[in-house]
């Protein structure tokens, strides 16, 4: 949801889009004409007196900000740049019992058909877990309920966690039960079948 929201906001708040809301672009003559033709008497009086109307745009009207494009620091020039920055670089830890985990794999709803990288964040240590053995099966309920596929589940509980920890520390899984499988995955290109 955050990913889609970033793109949605970029579309209306990038530097070029902000030009449409720049008070300096306000055509006062046109506003006055339209108000006189279609506005009520209170609106006409307000426009004539300049109440609530400003064509100033600068540091004094923007809290001292010179750059209003919130996305400029990331050098985003088109919406697909957000996918490259967000989807390729971020992982999100998720609890086993959170049904909204399925959204990460719903490429039909995610902009540019993106799959968001989720990490199975085991709930085993949580105070409200009544049975530690039930945490992983609880996560698998997303597959049983047909909200995600077995492939998605593998990404959630294995592939994404292995890439997250193993790409920053290739020895992370040494000595573990999954060392061989983790090494095989880390040796394969991203997106290759596990």
Give, region by region, the residue ranges found by the protein language model.
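Mid-to-C-terminal alpha-helical segments outside catalytic/metal-binding sites
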Residues: 29-83, 89-91, 95-117, 126-194
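Internal, charge-rich low-complexity segments
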Residues: 1-46
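Active-site glycine-centered loops adjacent to acidic/histidine catalytic or metal-binding residues
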Residues: 123
């Amino acid at each position: 949801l955050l990913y889609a929201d970033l793109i949605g906001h970029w579309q209306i708040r990038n530097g070029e889009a902000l030009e449409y809301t720049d008070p300096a672009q306000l055509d006062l003559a046109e506003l006055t004409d339209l108000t006189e033709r279609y506005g009520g008497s209170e609106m006409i009086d307000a426009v004539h007196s300049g109440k609530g109307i400003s064509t100033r745009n600068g540091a004094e009207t923007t809290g001292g900000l010179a750059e209003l494009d919130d996305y400029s620091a990331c050098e985003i020039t088109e919406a697909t740049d957000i996918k490259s920055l967000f989807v390729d670089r971020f992982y999100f830890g998720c609890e086993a019992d959170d049904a909204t985990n399925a959204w990460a794999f719903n490429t039909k709803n995610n902009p540019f058909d993106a799959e968001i990288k989720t990490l199975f964040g085991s709930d085993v240590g949580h105070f409200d877990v009544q049975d530690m053995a039930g945490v992983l099966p609880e996560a698998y309920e997303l597959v049983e309920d047909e909200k995600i596929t077995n492939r998605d589940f593998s990404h959630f509980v294995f592939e994404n966690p292995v890439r997250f920890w193993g790409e920053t520390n290739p020895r992370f899984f040494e000595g573990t039960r999954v060392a061989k499988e983790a090494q095989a995955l880390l040796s394969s290109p991203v997106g290759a079948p596990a």
